[in-house]
């Protein structure tokens, strides 16, 4: 891989003997920067640093943005913060929600103890996802939690970071794999075998109840292991970016 953002140029050489060699070269070592473009880029960067570099909050502990052990394997304090913020953001828009879920794979960095800047939050949530509202049944909630923890304790991008949901995963049991979700590489659960939900929104879980969930637009469209979200009876976007909500 040559990385991202056109930072490197990759050269692959295939010899007559079939041997393959690959090298990566930093792009800035191959070309001279155009002064006009470089000056403009520096000015834009200065504006960004001014806007996003100012501290607006403080944390006394590191907020865990690691993949594993972390947001793709277990509950984390950063996952709690983000999903609590989704609930708060929805309520600020006049929505009444029971809980919030975001995929652990969408959390991309740790915030170290100390001052917190907009840049920190944007680095944690870099994809521009927006806050969405869905309504699903308790049975559908069980399905997405079962599907999204199918390989736990191994890491999975869809691992559910939640607010307002108390649930457990019995990792001693295997995943009862059903049919493949259309257009994905994931499989629905044939039965609910590993996940038990205790409460949602502070009330005893009811598989027949309908729950209002705050989530992100990627998941609301069925991303990762959340195929059931795409068929939710109510599904709409509030147009608020997650990083701004947090």
Q: Which residue ranges define each predicted feature?
A:
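Short Gly/Pro-enriched turn/cap motifs at secondary-structure boundaries
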Residues: 2-4, 75-77, 122
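Preference for short coil/turn "hinge" residues that link or interrupt alpha-helices
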Residues: 2, 56, 71-74, 129, ...
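Active-site-adjacent helix-turn-beta-strand microarchitecture at beta-sheet edges
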Residues: 1-55, 152-160, 179-181
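Short amphipathic
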Residues: 23-25, 55-62, 133-135
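Hard-cation-handling environments
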Residues: 31-116
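Feature captures C-terminal
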Residues: 8, 19-22, 81-246
């Amino acid at each position: 891989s040559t990385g991202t953002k056109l930072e490197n140029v990759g050269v692959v050489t295939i010899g007559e003997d079939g041997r393959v060699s690959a090298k990566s070269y930093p792009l800035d070592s191959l070309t001279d920067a155009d002064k006009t473009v470089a000056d403009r880029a520096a000015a834009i960067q200065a504006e960004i640093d001014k806007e996003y570099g100012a501290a607006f909050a403080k944390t006394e502990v590191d907020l865990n943005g690691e993949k594993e052990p972390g947001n793709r394997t277990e509950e984390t304090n950063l996952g709690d913060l983000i999903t609590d913020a989704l609930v708060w953001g929805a309520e600020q828009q006049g929505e009444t929600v029971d809980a919030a879920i975001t995929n652990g794979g969408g959390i991309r960095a740790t915030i170290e103890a100390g001052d917190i800047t907009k840049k920190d939050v944007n680095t944690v949530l870099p994809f521009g996802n927006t806050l969405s509202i869905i309504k699903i049944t308790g049975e559908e909630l069980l399905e997405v939690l079962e599907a999204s923890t199918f390989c736990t304790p191994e890491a999975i991008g869809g691992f559910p970071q939640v607010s307002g949901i108390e649930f457990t995963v019995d990792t001693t049991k295997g995943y009862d794999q059903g049919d493949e979700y259309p257009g994905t590489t994931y499989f629905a659960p044939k039965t609910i075998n590993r996940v038990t939900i205790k409460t949602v929104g502070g009330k005893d879980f009811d598989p027949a109840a309908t729950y209002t969930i705050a989530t992100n637009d990627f998941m609301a469209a069925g991303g990762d292991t959340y195929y059931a979200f795409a068929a939710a009876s109510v599904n709409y976007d509030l147009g608020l970016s997650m990083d701004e909500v947090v």
